[in-house]
């Protein structure tokens, strides 16, 4: 029984973000479709070859996506919303981009599909839309074409396909309500057709991803798996693939399925390998997800070996990444500026492939010397002085309940804030960032590379902040922001100014479409050596009589959007960040900043996948926010912002944050998110986003007014704010000016009644 290895997927964007650059060039009309397709082909060929060279036996094919793999699956099934369809009914790459972005080089612009987080990761997928009586057919053969490409290159191919039940679970019904699970029988023939095509090509194994099987699914959804897989059996061997949690609670459902293998995440799940081995059918292959696909830490391979060795030789076994390596940067070897000791603690996607090769070889041979050698640096880290800061640990231990309480209740604070700011009804503001123009990015890059001295850099940033204030005053906004010209990223910026974080040069991971992020890495205890945002906030406030918001990223979001340590709890990391940022709130307040926004867009996405684990997480997540904010005086208005959220099931926790104002992303969901706030009788102020910043389309005054009137039916008008869905960093100035002008006009119209 020779053990093989495989990965569940590989990063798509390219080491130098080649895919991002090609996409954006094509969207801007600066390159042809054929040039874009060529970049995709080159990246796929390179990535397959890199995995093969690193020692991977079975290469994932079908993990590449032009925007998002769930959207690719929608096109595969012919699930294209009517507003995005080509007039002749055909499907092409621009169809895909219209669903994702709302527009493409061809076809009519239309509202983009809703976007939300992929399980509890920082990757986003485009939510499939389902309507009653919908028909499905195989229309987009990208998977088959890529399999042909890989076969032509003589690779050992393992196609990757998002499973039918998870696909339906991830979608939403549009229009007349019905049970989307009823569409299962309509999509299965397309899956059968795809599997038949793969069988024709001589494919032995197909990785069919059903991550919904790690959730606490309703019984009807669990019951759907057996008939679905009865329909799919027989053409190729199916590796039923789960990740992000364990499968033990749903194992009875899984073992009844006619598949030939199961992949389990042995990093994030609590499944016991020996117990799994006992309960799985004896002829099934077990794919053991031992290498963390979601983090950047070098694995202790001696531990991984010990975790799996008891079942070696007792059944067919593969070793694998826990999930797709999509969530990890590509290659550590190009990081030339990392300190050697710190660098020795990390492994990126290619290094993780090497770990899988080492593990496979040791399990096949019984020789563990190479594992011990590989694991030595991560074992040495446990005693490093870079990791532990006694002062931080002491302050954390001394936190009391009082540290997370504002001095007075919201009603008392609201009165003090009204007296201080004297804002009109329907007050207008933005979420924080303004367009990051080429000039701004060049300025920051030149400074970073040493081509620009500190004085000239500061003068340049000050000019952009001044311009942002002038633009906002001209537009007539009520509460201003400084525009964040000095910030590369809302998390990276804070990480750069806090001790306990390190940064990479090329550690990019895909967030959605062409958007990539370079998450900071938490390597040790976190503290704030000096004020971070005070100087620029103070400067911006000196330019205007209107209030300017101080802008902070909240502790849970910094945690969720960083690569965390694995040796302490997430709660510990969040509270260390909260204490550091608490000092920032006090300093902003002392500098005369009266409105401070603490963004927590990631609060909901940090939720554990199983509801039974939610309460503990929400308790410390809310406490971290409150520790951060509670130092503020009554007449300091604390705002928070949240994105892509379903709030109804966590409204208690949203209210418990006790922010004076919450702004939320609602435009893509047509204000339906406000139902939660209405039903809960949310007591504080709220700014429902009135237009989608992910799309370049400019909303009309009438459209915004209609949304606000809809909002006022649910929330008393005197507690409503008017704002976009999110920050405007990724937009251009022309559409930003036009959209904000319409937003301000809509608010003014409503004030006049």
UniProtKB/Swiss-Prot annotation:
Coiled coil: none annotated. PANTHER family: 5-METHYLTETRAHYDROPTEROYLTRIGLUTAMATE--HOMOCYSTEINE METHYLTRANSFERASE. Binds 1 zinc ion per subunit. This is 5-methyltetrahydropteroyltriglutamate--homocysteine methyltransferase. GO terms for biological process: methionine biosynthetic process; methylation. Belongs to the vitamin-B12 independent methionine synthase family. InterPro entries: Cbl-indep_Met_Synth_N, Cobalamin-indep_Met_synthase, Met_Synth_C/arc, UROD/MetE-like_sf. L-methionine binds at residues 431-433, 484, 599. It holds the Pfam family Meth_synt_2. SUPFAM superfamilies: UROD/MetE-like (SSF51726). One of its GO terms (molecular function) is 5-methyltetrahydropteroyltriglutamate-homocysteine S-methyltransferase activity. It catalyses: 5-methyltetrahydropteroyltri-L-glutamate + L-homocysteine = tetrahydropteroyltri-L-glutamate + L-methionine. It comes from Shigella flexneri serotype 5b (strain 8401). L-homocysteine binds at residues 431-433, 484, 599. The active site is at residue 694. Zn(2+) binds at residues 641, 643, 665, 726. Its EC number is 2.1.1.14. NCBIfam families: met_syn_B12ind, PRK05222.1. Catalyzes the transfer of a methyl group from 5-methyltetrahydrofolate to homocysteine resulting in methionine formation. The lineage of its organism: Bacteria, Pseudomonadati, Pseudomonadota, Gammaproteobacteria, Enterobacterales. The keyword Iron does not apply. 5-methyltetrahydropteroyltri-L-glutamate binds at residues 17-20, 117, 515-516, 561, 605. Its cofactor is Zn(2+).
